[in-house]
Structures are given as structure tokens and as C-alpha cells.
Design a protein with these regions (language model features):
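A structural motif corresponding to the C-terminal lobe/cap of the Radical SAM core domain
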Residues: 1-120, 124, 146-148, 196-197, ...
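C-terminal non-catalytic accessory extensions
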Residues: 134-216
């Protein structure tokens, strides 16, 4: 009904929230895709961005925030909060499944007639076939494979080491190209618990008594 009045709709989902458990969140998302074929789904991975939300303090107290370089904190190339109710393989299996379902030829074909005007129709097709759709399926599938085959990636995601795996380091070097050499020392590392540490160092406010001024 909304598409009668608004030519293009994108629906945003955040995957990996603490309330998510089991297969149900992924199954319900697939159900949404079936019931609202005209809406373009955009999936984001749970991320803690510094002081962006007080909830980040809880993640840091629990030791769940990972030191991913800022280069990857774009909501889809890395999830810097360890999921509460999933192992990493379980989470990526669900993520890949729902992403494949959302950008399958069947879903793309149903999205076209559900959209009224020509430009939004083609935008849905192009976005699904680009890095936003098929590209992310390929990337997430690669991460899932590395979880089984590259111990450095698995240890990093489990929070057992803060040494950035070669896979991520090489990607930064490749994407920055000639600009990579200008990165300062330590640019790919940061303290993931800086917010918590700064909050614990903030001095407590002392009560101040206000005395009424005596009439002269």
C-alpha cells in the first residue's frame, strides 16, 4: 500500500542483536521478504561505534567488543560485537542464508512488479546484483570459510587475540592502494574499550549546597 504513494522503499535490519536467538530472527526476516516484495532489504551487522550509545559500555564490560580497524566499521564488512546467543559459524550461516534468499532471482523478480515506476524497478535490480546484494553474499561466504580454515581469523573474532589477521590487513592495503603507505604507525589498531576506560576515570560529581543570600 505504501508503494502507491512512495516510489521507493528500503527497509533496514540490524542482525546480531542480543535479543536474537536461534533461527527464528532469520526465518521471520525471510517471511517479511515474502510479504513485502517491493521493499528493498538492507542488512547491517551489529556494531559498537565508540560513544554512540551507552549500550556500548555494557558490551565493553562483557569483553565483547573487538578491535576491528575503523576501515571495516561500515555495518557490513565486520561485526565488532561478539554475538550473545550465536557462535560465529552459526551467525554467519544465518546471515548468508537470509542474504541469499533476499537477493535470489526469485526475490528480484518479485520485487520488480511490486514497484510502480521504472527507475525504482531498475534500482532494485542493480542494487541486488551489485556489492550490496551478491557482493555481500560473496564476502560473507568468504568470512564463513575463513572461520573454518584460518585460525587467525577465528581467534580474532573470538577475542582471543588483538593481532589483525592477514586477510583484513591485506584488504586494507589493497583498497587504499598508494595511500596505504601514508598511514601512521598503529593506524589499524585502537583500544576497543576506550569508552569504558574514560567513563571509569570521570570524577564523580560532588554535591553543592546553595545558600540563600541574606537580605542586607
Amino acid at each position: 500500500m505504501i508503494l502507491r504513494y512512495i516510489p521507493y522503499i528500503q527497509t533496514n535490519f540490524v542482525l546480531g542483536l542480543d535479543g536474537d536467538n536461534g533461527t527464528e530472527p532469520f526465518e521471520l526476516t525471510r517471511k517479511f521478504i515474502d510479504l513485502a516484495p517491493g521493499a528493498f532489504p538492507a542488512y547491517s551487522l551489529l556494531s559498537a561505534f565508540g560513544r554512540a550509545a551507552p549500550l556500548n559500555l555494557e558490551y565493553q564490560r562483557a569483553g565483547r567488543v573487538l578491535p576491528f580497524p575503523f576501515h571495516f566499521l561500515n555495518n557490513n564488512h565486520a561485526m565488532n560485537v561478539r554475538p550473545k546467543h550465536y557462535s560465529w559459524p552459526e551467525f554467519y550461516d544465518g546471515l548468508i542464508d537470509v542474504t541469499r534468499y533476499s537477493f535470489s532471482w526469485r526475490a528480484i523478480a518479485r520485487r520488480v512488479p511490486a514497484t510502480a515506476t521504472a527507475i525504482p524497478k531498475w534500482m532494485n535490480v542493480v542494487r541486488a546484483m551489485s556489492s550490496e546484494g551478491w557482493g555481500r553474499i560473496e564476502y560473507h561466504t568468504k568470512i564463513r570459510r575463513l572461520l573454518d580454515t584460518d585460525r587467525s581469523v577465528r581467534d580474532y573474532l573470538e577475542g582471543e587475540t588483538n593481532v589483525l589477521p592477514a586477510f583484513y590487513h591485506d584488504r586494507i592495503r589493497r583498497e587504499l592502494g598508494p595511500l596505504y603507505e601514508y598511514l601512521p604507525d598503529g593506524a589499524v589498531y585502537h583500544d576497543p574499550n576506550a569508552y569504558l576506560e574514560s567513563a571509569s576515570q570521570t570524577p564523580a560529581a560532588e554535591p553543592v549546597s546553595l545558600r540563600s543570600r541574606r537580605a542586607g
